Amino acid sequence: VWWEAHLVCPTLNVSGFTMAGAPGIALGHNRHVAWGVTNVMVDDVDFFIEKINPDNPRQYLYQGRWEDMQIVEETIRIKGKDPVKIEIGLTRHGPILEDNNKGTEPTAMAVKWAFTDGLQSAKAFYLLNKATNTHEVALALKYWELPGQNVVFADTGGNIGYWCCAAVPIRSRGDGLLPVPGWSGEYEWKGYVPFEMRPHLINPEPGYIATANNKVASGNYPHFISHYWEPVDRITRIHQLLNTSQKLSVDKFK
């Protein structure tokens, strides 16, 4: 997935790692700033159980009324075989993954995923490549929505920062741990947590910032992010090493 690259042009000199199709370096450094990432582990997917009209499999129930699915035809190309065409039903909660049309009360499972909401991060990559200080990095990170990443950054002026860059759903009810009834309207997403309200740090008191796919918000944070944090072993060890009394140097980190 990742490719190492060094991009040089009259207005750009940036090195790091990127992905095919990304407009520049996704994580790395230029002459002024450096940035890296770990996974936020954000839960940005919910599953909705839809009630299907027994008289019309292309309709589903929502708040007492049948709504028409949007039908999209996709062509799956298979090496050495004829292409296969499939129809996908789209609901207000997302595409239908599977259905159960047996019996008098057929149902289907729809998936609501932040990636299907047209969010993107391409502009963030471009602006990060041109940033000259942590303030400009933070401005660039406003456009980093997917995939959800913990971005740590520093500039040559000695400033450091961290921002939770992820599309964190604001759920009307529940935490998305289990499939929910799609027909009630009680479990809708009300958008995403604004950039300024996501966990972040600028020049914190300890003088360093560490992240290792661990929990990024305290218990009193008002928005649900995830249940799926990695174990604390790595972040605990990082804190132990960084809090040591011995002086840390570039050679020591190597």
Regions from the PLM with identified roles:
Residues V1-K254:
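Mature extracytoplasmic enzyme cores
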